[in-house]
């Protein structure tokens, strides 16, 4: 399924950047614009970043980066941190003369825990942590992947869906606010954590809803450079195939982060995705653009409805799903 609300651009391919000079096109004449762009080879449909497809792509890219990072460490664990009644944080909002309190996630609690953990453990670690609310109780809790962390006092306490879960008094005391369990991490848990960051609507509108309830918005925090070492070591291979082979032979597109790494030395404005100053990145993106136009041409040829109608059908499917393969939370 494609992005259901793409931004349509026309490219001036004579410009020295990969995408050329991008001119935003209005969508009133979408069909004719696409037909003309496919024929001329100067069309770019850039993802909106908000629809179901785009959200899933963002989560998939994070899951891929986490999996690549995990290959560089001997110890990788999946950790869940929850609150006891004594320590669960509350936010407050005043409506009229009434004060309303709601349980809330706390990024500060997680940051202080990480500070204590680094001081106590003393070995290098990396992490990817998502803070969120339970679907049923709305209770705040945290899931994380920790690289390089191995609690020595882990004690088995249950098996669930084929995974062994352990408790650690040392890790629980460092958290200091309730309960902690962990299990050996695997590709399934990488995707599990990555999906949490996108399972609900993202952006200012959703954040405002939380603030109106006196709650902090759901969040994610992570170490810098997740997956960077792997991407740098395999750069030539990735450039040649524009694919990454993950566990089980799964083929993944390189995360957008790879483009930034590839162009980092030649492009000081690394945040500008459309300025590809390195020859390697220009070549990779030119190939992607050609493939995208060919796919669009095939879709136009083999689909009985206009592309704009096709997108509307996909949007309706998106609305009906509401939730896409999201983790089933029991909290």
Where are these regions (language model features)?
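Residues in well-ordered beta-strands of folded domains
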Residues: 52, 80, 128-130, 145, ...
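DNA replication initiation on ssDNA origins
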Residues: 1-67, 297-301
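A structural signal for well-ordered alpha-helical segments within the folded catalytic domains
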Residues: 49, 107-111, 191
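Sequence-level motif detector for i,i+2 pairs with an aromatic at +2
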Residues: 46-49, 73-78, 124, 177, ...
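C-terminal non-catalytic accessory extensions
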Residues: 181, 286-331
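Signature for HUH/AEP ssDNA processing cores
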Residues: 57-136
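Conserved His + Asp/Glu catalytic blocks
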Residues: 135-140, 146-286
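Intrinsic-disorder/low-complexity loop/linker signature
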Residues: 37, 82, 87-98, 159-162, ...
């Amino acid at each position: 399924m494609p992005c259901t609300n793409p931004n349509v651009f026309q490219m001036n391919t004579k410009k020295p950047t990969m995408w050329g000079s991008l001119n935003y096109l209005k969508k009133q004449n979408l069909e004719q614009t696409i037909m003309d762009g496919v024929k001329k080879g100067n069309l770019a449909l850039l993802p909106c970043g908000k629809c179901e497809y785009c959200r899933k792509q963002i989560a998939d890219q994070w899951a891929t980066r986490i999996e690549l990072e995990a290959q560089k460490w001997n110890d990788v664990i999946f950790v869940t941190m929850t609150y006891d009644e004594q320590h669960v944080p509350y936010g407050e909002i005043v409506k009229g003369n009434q004060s309303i309190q709601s349980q809330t996630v706390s990024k500060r609690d997680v940051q202080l825990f990480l500070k204590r953990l680094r001081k106590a453990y003393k070995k290098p670690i990396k992490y990817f942590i998502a803070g969120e609310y339970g679907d049923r109780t709305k209770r705040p809790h945290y899931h994380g992947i920790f690289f390089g962390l191995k609690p020595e006092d882990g004690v088995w306490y249950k098996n669930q869906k084929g995974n062994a879960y352990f408790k650690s008094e040392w890790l629980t005391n460092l958290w200091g606010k309730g309960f902690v369990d962990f299990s050996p991490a695997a590709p399934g848990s990488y995707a599990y954590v990555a999906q949490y960051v996108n399972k609900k609507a993202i952006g200012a509108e959703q954040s405002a809803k939380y603030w109106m309830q006196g709650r902090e918005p759901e969040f994610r925090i992570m170490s810098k450079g997740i997956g960077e070492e792997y991407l740098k070591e395999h750069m030539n291979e990735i450039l040649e195939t524009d694919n990454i082979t993950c566990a089980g032979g799964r083929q993944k597109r390189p995360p957008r982060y790879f483009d930034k790494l590839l162009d980092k030395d030649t492009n000081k404005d690394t945040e500008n995705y459309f300025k590809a100053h390195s020859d390697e990145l220009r070549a990779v993106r030119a190939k992607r653009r050609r493939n995208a136009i060919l796919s669009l041409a095939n879709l136009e040829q083999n689909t009985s409805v206009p592309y704009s109608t096709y997108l509307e059908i996909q949007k309706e499917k998106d609305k009906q799903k509401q939730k896409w393969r999201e983790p089933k939370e029991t909290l």
